[in-house]
């Protein structure tokens, strides 16, 4: 008998059926097939899905960032989401752990993530997963390229 009712898989290919399932279970920001296929075709990108037989219950998007200094590479855990109905069941922690395992496979020196301090769930998850809150005064700027 499995330990959990969910599993985590790295997605290397996306077809219409998977896209429809993702967009059904996570309708807030619908994915576009061509963009999703480009994302997963790049070996420096990671897409993890946590699934039950009926639901995509968690998603990770991460990127390998090559360094020019003494560090070999870093992994940016760009996005992690767990469906509210299944939070606090270890899915978020397992997704962070799977991302860290991928980073180790790549030889990355560390993995990092940004979040708002007001996001109590994320702060608790990252602490529980062994993350260190080591940059207290960070600002993020966005530049439009259009």
Model-derived segments and spans:
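Terminal substrate-recognition subdomain of acyl/acetyltransferases
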Residues: 138-146
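Acetyl-CoA-dependent GNAT
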Residues: 3-72, 78, 96-97
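Residue-level recognition of the GNAT/N-acetyltransferase active site
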Residues: 83, 116
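Hydrophobic/basic alpha-helical segments enriched in Actinobacteria
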Residues: 10, 56-57, 93, 102-105, ...
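Conserved active-site alpha-helix within GNAT-family acetyltransferase domains
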Residues: 93, 105, 109, 117-136
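Conserved acetyl-CoA pyrophosphate-binding loop and the N-cap/start of the following alpha-helix
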Residues: 86, 90-98
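Conserved hydrophobic beta-strand within the GNAT/NAT acetyltransferase core sheet
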Residues: 77, 111-115
